[in-house]
């Protein structure tokens, strides 16, 4: 009896693994890379670049890719900017450094190296959600190489961050044995689809999920490498924010803090705190808007960019 049960379990695991491989191949066919690549420290990074003029660099949050900013990229290019959006390391078609836990400052260093290779000088940095702390860390590490920062619903402090008191899913996924089995058999199953639906509904609330976004999330976020990168980032955020926030008062460059009045993640409170610590920053709280500003309100991204020069 037990041998039959073991055999059945093995067949199920092999079947799920094969389905995952097939599903990943279909994702790459449906959503091929639409940008270019640059290699930094042996890590290949994918980016989109459009337009000519002053450079704006967009850094996405924790679910999808640089394409989160696709509408803002189009608007920026139309309005005379050179718009660059990276897939952060491990997301989209960007590689992630192997055999180490990647910190936000590791990602800062890689993005900085990529921009130097691309000949970018003194860009404006735009960071959304999780990238709030990373964007500020970049400005603190390279203060003479950034002309301004825009934070969109940014997470900047460990206090109030969802994983501040621990995150069981992230702990499971980043376990070297159980995590790999989960990622290569379960994550693209109906369980993963249910998790995606729950996550997106909460993340976009109280606003609608844009057409096609759910499908793209199922395709990209539920890839083993990207989901693991996301959960590593969740765990890395708390110590990174704790360290970076000690230096926020040192920020001297122009800074715009934009947050939705109805953001469900507590970023409004973080925005007010950052404004107190960086008095010259401009704080803009937008009525009726939630967390996903780049996806639902690209025109607000442009308004924030314009406010840098006001």
What annotation goes with each model-predicted range?
Residues 26, 161-163, 185-250:
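Conserved alpha/beta-hydrolase catalytic His-Asp/Glu region
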Residues 49-93:
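Conserved HGGG/HGGXW glycine-rich cap/lid loop of the alpha/beta-hydrolase fold
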Residues 150-185:
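Flexible "cap/lid" loop of the alpha/beta hydrolase fold
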Residues 236, 261-266, 291:
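Acidic catalytic loop of the alpha/beta-hydrolase fold
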Residues 251, 257-259:
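Short beta-strand/loop motif that positions the catalytic acidic residue
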Residues 280-310:
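Catalytic active-site module of serine/aspartate enzymes centered on a nucleophile-bearing elbow/loop
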């Amino acid at each position: 009896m037990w041998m039959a049960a073991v055999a059945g379990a093995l067949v199920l695991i092999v079947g799920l693994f094969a389905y995952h491989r097939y599903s990943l191949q279909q994702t790459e066919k449906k959503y091929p890379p639409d940008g270019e690549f640059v290699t930094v420290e042996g890590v290949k990074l994918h980016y989109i670049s459009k337009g000519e003029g002053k450079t704006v660099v967009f850094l996405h949050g924790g679910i999808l890719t640089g394409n989160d900013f696709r509408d803002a990229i189009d608007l920026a290019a139309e309005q005379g900017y050179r718009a660059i959006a990276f897939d952060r390391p491990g997301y989209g078609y960007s590689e992630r450094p192997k055999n180490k836990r990647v910190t936000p400052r590791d990602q800062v260093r890689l993005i900085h190296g990529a921009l130097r290779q691309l000949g970018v000088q003194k860009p404006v940095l735009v960071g959304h959600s999780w990238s709030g702390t990373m964007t500020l860390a970049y400005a603190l590490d390279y203060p003479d190489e950034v002309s301004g920062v825009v934070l969109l619903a940014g997470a900047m402090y460990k206090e109030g961050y969802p994983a501040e008191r621990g995150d069981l899913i992230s702990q499971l996924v980043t376990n070297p044995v159980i995590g790999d089995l989960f990622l290569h058999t379960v994550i693209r199953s109906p369980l993963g689809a249910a998790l995606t639906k729950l996550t997106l509904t909460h993340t976009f609330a109280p606003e609608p999920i844009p057409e096609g976004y759910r499908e793209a999330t199922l395709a990209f976020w539920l890839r083993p490498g990207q989901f693991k990168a996301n959960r590593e980032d969740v765990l890395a955020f708390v110590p990174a924010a704790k360290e970076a926030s000690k230096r926020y008062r040192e920020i001297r460059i122009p800074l715009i803090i934009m947050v939705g009045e109805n953001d469900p993640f507590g970023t409004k409170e973080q925005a007010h705190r950052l404004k107190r610590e960086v008095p010259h920053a401009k704080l803009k709280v937008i009525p009726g808007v939630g967390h996903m500003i780049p996806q639902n309100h690209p025109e607000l991204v442009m308004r924030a960019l314009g406010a840098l020069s006001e």
